[in-house]
Swiss-Prot record:
Keyword set includes tRNA-binding: no
Main function: Catalyzes the conversion of 1-hydroxy-2-methyl-2-(E)-butenyl 4-diphosphate (HMBPP) into a mixture of isopentenyl diphosphate (IPP) and dimethylallyl diphosphate (DMAPP). Acts in the terminal step of the DOXP/MEP pathway for isoprenoid precursor biosynthesis.
Keyword vocabulary terms for this entry: 4Fe-4S, Iron, Iron-sulfur, Isoprene biosynthesis, Metal-binding, Oxidoreductase
Top EC class for this record: oxidoreductase
UniProt: isopentenyl diphosphate binding residues: H41, H74, H124, S225, S226, N227, S269
Required cofactor(s): [4Fe-4S] cluster
BP GO annotations: dimethylallyl diphosphate biosynthetic process; isopentenyl diphosphate biosynthetic process, methylerythritol 4-phosphate pathway; terpenoid biosynthetic process
Residues in the signal sequence: none
Organism: Colwellia psychrerythraea (strain 34H / ATCC BAA-681)
MF annotations from Gene Ontology: 4 iron, 4 sulfur cluster binding; 4-hydroxy-3-methylbut-2-enyl diphosphate reductase activity; metal ion binding
UniProt-recorded name of the protein: 4-hydroxy-3-methylbut-2-enyl diphosphate reductase
Length: 309
């Protein structure tokens, strides 16, 4: 059985930065350090930070006064920022800079009183943070997930609209929704470059590259990781039996029956150690050759805040 590794895979610059911010805050200020929401969607990473003294909370009212809080890579609403400021909490912002870019787009159209349509998944922390950049007294912001949502969408002024998207969506699905928006609202405007982040795009492209070369695809990533789920969905759409796994322990040996080539990739919040463990497990199940499939090299690095360097 050949093991074909997709490239790129695993950590992206935004995840690296977010984890580094929590680690550096713990190094400099000591435990406890509070983090609003999982800093990234990966249990292994979160548990490791918990062991070092990070405390993960859902809301700021769980953070005691005079403490340090870190906002997760997914970003937060303006209301959350204001609450932290009002309480004089020490804040470090681990929001991915590419998410911040979308926040700035939404804030800009809100100030101009332009209705905004966000393409994204309801309930995802990034979507909640992005929706929360839009002022409640402006024209309005709407969330759509599919062309069907677009078909039933009613806006106040079809001639004055702007769209943007969650950064971790399926590239193909997002293009379908954008096409539906442009067909229904010909004057709608959007970002010069789509909001899907480079890491999401590259990892989906890498799956496309190897999908027709493998009999099975394993995606290392958490069940609540948007970009990991999109990788699994993409491989499945391309006709490959695919599974999303947290760790090597999730591999079921009957998946490998009759499999000659297995592809391995990982979401942007999955650490290299978990990918390595999956490869080692596959070797123990009969994998005799590991092939690194060539892909796009990533050199982007996002700096941590100056106070933490």
């Amino acid at each position: 059985m050949e093991i074909i590794l997709a490239n790129p895979r695993g950590f992206c610059a935004g995840v690296d930065r977010a984890i580094s911010i929590v680690e550096r805050a713990l190094d400099l200020f000591g435990a406890p350090i509070y983090v609003r929401h999982e800093v990234v969607h990966n249990k292994f990473v979160v548990d490791g930070l918990k062991d070092r003294g990070a405390i993960f909370v859902d809301e700021l009212d769980e953070v005691p006064d005079d403490n340090t809080v870190i906002f997760s890579a997914h970003g937060v609403s303006k209301a959350v920022r204001q609450e932290a400021k009002t309480r004089a909490l020490k804040v470090f912002d681990a929001t991915c800079p590419l998410v911040t870019k979308v926040h700035m787009e939404v804030s800009r159209v809100s100030r101009k009183d332009i209705e905004c349509i966000l393409i994204g998944h309801a309930g995802h922390p990034e979507v909640e943070g992005t929706m929360g950049q839009y002022s409640s007294d402006s024209a309005g912001i709407y969330l759509v997930e599919s062309p069907e949502d677009v078909a039933s969408l009613v806006v106040k002024n079809p001639e004055k609209l702007y769209f943007c998207s969650q950064t971790t969506l399926s590239v193909d699905d997002t293009m379908d929704v954008i096409a539906a928006l442009q067909a229904k609202f010909p004057l709608i405007e959007g970002p010069r470059k789509d909001d899907i982040c480079y890491a999401t795009q590259n990892r989906q492209d890498a799956v496309r590259e190897i999908a027709d070369k493998v009999d099975l695809m394993l995606v290392v990533g958490a069940k609540n990781s948007s970009n990991s789920n999109r990788l699994k969905e993409l491989a499945s759409k391309m006709g490959v039996t695919s599974y999303l796994i947290d760790t090597a322990e999730n591999i079921e040996t009957d998946w490998l029956t009759g499999v000659n080539k297995v592809g391995v990739t990982a979401g942007a919040s999955a650490p290299a150690v978990l990918i390595k463990q999956v490869v080692e497990a596959l070797k123990s199940y009969g994998g005799h050759q590991v092939i690194e499939h060539p892909g796009k090299e990533e050199s982007i690095v996002f700096a941590v805040p100056a106070e933490l360097r």
